[in-house]
Amino acid sequence: MLCRSNDELELLISQARAFAGQGEVAQYIPALAAAHKHELSVALYYPDGKGFMAGDTEENFTLQSISKVLSLALALIDQGEECVFTRVGKEPTGDPFNSIAKLETNKPSKPLNPMINAGALAVTHMIKGNTAGERFERLLDFIRCLTGNETITYNKEIAKSEFETAHLNRALVYFMKEHGVIDEDVEELMDLYTKQCAIEMNCIDLARVGCVLAMDGCDPDTGKQLLPIDVARICKTFMVTCGMYNASGEFAINVGIPAKSGVSGGIMGAVPKKCGIGICGPSLDEKGNSIAGIKLLEMMAKRYSLSMF
């Protein structure tokens, strides 16, 4: 039996929030450093179109690495599975999400998977469009379709902040350009990617996207197929194997659902055939995941038997 009460969620939120003090908000992106570490919110979205929520669920936050799932979905639709995976691998890595190490040591020199920064940059490179601006608008329209929210946009301040400080990501792009993975202007790709990471939504929007994935690409409100079934399957698989950075294995054991986190404190979950989950808690653990958000999901997994394993 899944949660059917906002009060139930409020109780779980109050218990999980106590762990927020053990983490810190992201400091390396100046515009994210101003977040309040004890904030925590959650929303559930069900296949019948109903939703339940607790905390500041209408407060917007930036997707950051959660956007990697959505850019992957669009790139797969645009280019097909074979093309995408000639440039990006399918294997997890125990390295930090922004590491360059495996790019240098693996042959051929392509990113191990789409959920690390190098892989996400290569994936964003594959989104179709004549200009970086056109490609971003296509991605934005795609995300608006998945959320059912036409007002979704991006945070210009955070995009600018990330663009100005993305020195390591630029190094990744230059390295991949040298090895033929990427063949576009570095600054154009960085502009597109930082805007992608700065796309904003609230927990309800995020839970709805999670529900679309949970229902194999089907819109929970209209029944329309928004994503090809195989695209939804591939995205969920990467969420299980790589979605929680280099804590993905531990998360699979303790929670057991496809999920993707971001350094703004967001987590998107997709409980297959049951519901989508959207969480935001800016206080992060040492792996870059929302510390209270993970505790909340662990509590929910036990209480509602969410694990798919």
From Swiss-Prot:
Q: Name one GO molecular function term.
A: glutaminase activity
Q: Write out the residues that bind substrate.
A: 65, 117, 162, 169, 193, 245, 263
Segments forming a coiled coil: none
**Entry EC no(s):** 3.5.1.2
Q: Which reaction does it catalyse?
A: L-glutamine + H2O = L-glutamate + NH4(+)
Record's InterPro entries?
A: Beta-lactam/transpept-like, Glutaminase
Q: Name one GO biological process term.
A: glutamine catabolic process
Entry's Pfam families?
Answer: Glutaminase
Q: Which domain of life is it from?
A: Bacteria
* Keywords carried by this UniProt record: Hydrolase
Q: How does it assemble?
A: Homotetramer.
Q: What's this protein's family per the entry?
A: Belongs to the glutaminase family.
Q: What is this protein called?
A: Glutaminase
Instruction: Give the species.
Output: Shouchella clausii (strain KSM-K16) (Alkalihalobacillus clausii)
